[in-house]
Amino acid sequence: MDPITTLATRLGEHLRRFNAQVTTAESCTGGGIAEAITRVPGSSAWFEAGYVTYSNAQKTRQLGVPEVLFGQVGAVSQEVVEAMVRGAQAASGARFAVAVSGVAGPDGGSPAKPVGTVWLAWGDGSRVFSERRQFDGDREAVRRQTVIAALDGLLQLGTE
């Protein structure tokens, strides 16, 4: 079985045990996390909603990310992904959430945020955790590694 499908299946098993639901807020993965989750039969029991907010305007409109953050720290930042997690939880009512924003490439990188830079955040209803990751490879490799890291982080939330 594909590692992404394996992680998503394990996530579903954990969420069913908690009788909990998850939501996703995605930028650079373009819905890839939600797609991986909904690949799992029965995911409608534990997947509440997915938000693909590729533009900054949609991050603000759909998830309530303060517009001022984009000018202060940029879309690929800890502050933005943490706001995305909180916004997705508020909009969906799901207990667990994951958010990602990154530079998948091949363009768009900078010295401070080179191609492969991704910020991820996870929320469990009371706490939000985030981390910056640097992935290697082409656009698809960065996106795939981001999906894996996002699902793995959700699994770790569910087992703490």
Swiss-Prot record:
InterPro entries: CinA-like_C, CinA_C. One of its GO terms (biological process) is pyridine nucleotide biosynthetic process. GO terms for molecular function: nicotinamide-nucleotide amidase activity. The keyword Transmembrane does not apply. Coiled coil: none annotated. Gene3D superfamilies: CinA-like (3.90.950.20). It catalyses: beta-nicotinamide D-ribonucleotide + H2O = nicotinate beta-D-ribonucleotide + NH4(+). Its EC number is 3.5.1.42. Keywords: Hydrolase, Pyridine nucleotide biosynthesis. It holds the Pfam family CinA. Homodimer. Has NMN aminohydrolase activity, not active on other substrates. Belongs to the CinA family. PncC subfamily. This is Nicotinamide-nucleotide amidohydrolase PncC.
